[in-house]
Amino acid sequence: MTTPPICSYEGSDYQERFWDQADRAYEDRVEAIALRRLLPESGRRLLELGAGAGRNTPRYTGFEQIVLVDYSRTQLEQAQQRLGTGRRYTYVAADIYRLPFAPSAFPAATMIRTLHHMADPQAALRQVRRGLATGGTFVLEFANKRNLKSIARWLLRRQTWSPFDRSPVEFAKLNFDFHPQAVADWLRAADFRLERRLSVSHFRLPLFKRLLPLSALVGLDSLVQWTGELWQLTPSVFVRARAIGADEPAPSGAFWRCPACAGLELHDQLDGLACASCHRVWPLRDGIYDFRESPA
């Protein structure tokens, strides 16, 4: 089965270069506020899609188990170094378009700073919905093409694409901005009900960061995030959606799903997970399950 192209951070120093060494403490803190407002305080199991090096994972303190998924094994290795290898964390290298989880395996999921790398966001959202139980919570962040900066640039004829057109814009290879209404439509089509929207990162421009202290910027952003219910004009938008409709049938307690044959009976063995249906063995190396390439 062919899948859309994948944006891989394999071997990347993204966490260090983009977050640790760059001036993005403001973005990090306002995203943390949005997550607190949208996620349940506690839960049995959380699916973190696009977990990367685990920047947000420590914020999910109320969940008993967190399953970190990323296409990049090296990003997950960094997450392991940050979080450890205890039973609370499960590390999974996987393709978002072929997630290795049984239907209804999770009561909650997040996807932060990840959808903007999806060439087929609708297919990705359908995969998320299949893994969530009916009534489950999904917190999604996406890059908003209809933000004030892009509107101004378009009005001044400094960019060719319209921020009001609902089609995604690919401003760099496998980097997309999305229209808020398009994302809302995709979520509904995937059997999600939108519950809340937050506008985040109002003051991302370097000018604001030079003029105001970090605490003031964070406080101001926190005060106006609620405006996402009225309009979405910030570069980042957070959405809380609820899984609705009927779940796919699955045996009670099923967790894994073979990406190759869709079998739901996978057994632990020393070197990985063996599918009882197609007999493939999905490898487990140094505490990281790898479902990216189909083994022979």
Name each model feature, range by range.
Residues 1-42, 75-78, 139-162, 292-296:
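Conserved class I S-adenosyl-L-methionine
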Residues 160, 185, 196-270:
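A C-terminal cap/extension of S-adenosyl-L-methionine-dependent methyltransferases
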Residues 110:
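A conserved beta-strand element that flanks and buttresses the S-adenosyl-L-methionine
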Residues 161-182:
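Acceptor-substrate binding/catalytic loop of class I
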Residues 47, 51-98:
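Class I SAM-dependent methyltransferase SAM/SAH-binding core
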Residues 122-137:
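A short glycine-rich, Lys/Arg-flanked "PGG" loop and its adjoining helix->strand segment in the class I
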Residues 113-117:
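Short catalytic micro-motifs in class I SAM-dependent methyltransferases
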